[in-house]
Amino acid sequence: MKQYRQGAWKCLAFLFMLAVVIGALAGCSGKQDGEELSAAAVAERIQRAVNLDEMNQGDRKKLHKLYHLDADEVEDFILYTAASNVKADELAVIKVKDADQAESVKQNILQRIEAQTVKFKDYRPEEYFLIEKHVLKTKGRFVFFAVSKEAAQMEAAFDSAW
């Protein structure tokens, strides 16, 4: 009987160690830097954090018009702009095909920021303030840009996607 108990304890110890090893391997095999994440999935997180109903969703043509980005640079994106041209609100989450392209996309967005700054500086000071407080950042193959009163919440939702 004693030998049976000793064998049972060894078996239990082995199963416990096996569970720990499997758990460790599963925990270390997570996604790398959001590579499998889509712009739509990130947008869904942002929509849960802030209300985008008063903004218009943009298409590839609008993306090209605002940021001068070609289809060969962008793998996936979401774009929201203000419903009126007297508002500066914008939200863009752009997933580039290659992480090296993120910096050039960021430069194109900076040109858009400069153009909006000139447009709103004297015309609509409260909108100019929002442009000055914009959020522009990259994370892996993603470029995030937000001009809004709720830009901080949008940024937090973007960051939490990983």
Name each model feature, range by range.
Residues 2-15:
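Bacterial N-terminal signal peptides that target proteins for export
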Residues 23-27:
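C-terminal motif of bacterial Sec signal peptides marking the signal peptidase cleavage site
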Residues 35-56:
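Post-signal peptide N-terminal segment of mature Sec-exported envelope proteins
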Residues 38, 42, 59, 63, ...:
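Stable alpha-helical elements in mature extracytoplasmic
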Residues 57-86, 100-104:
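Short, compositionally biased low-complexity segments enriched in polar/charged residues
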Residues 83, 126-162:
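A short, solvent-exposed beta-edge/loop patch
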Residues 88-98:
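A short acidic-to-branched-hydrophobic micro-motif
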Residues 99-138:
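Short Gly/Thr-rich strand-loop-strand
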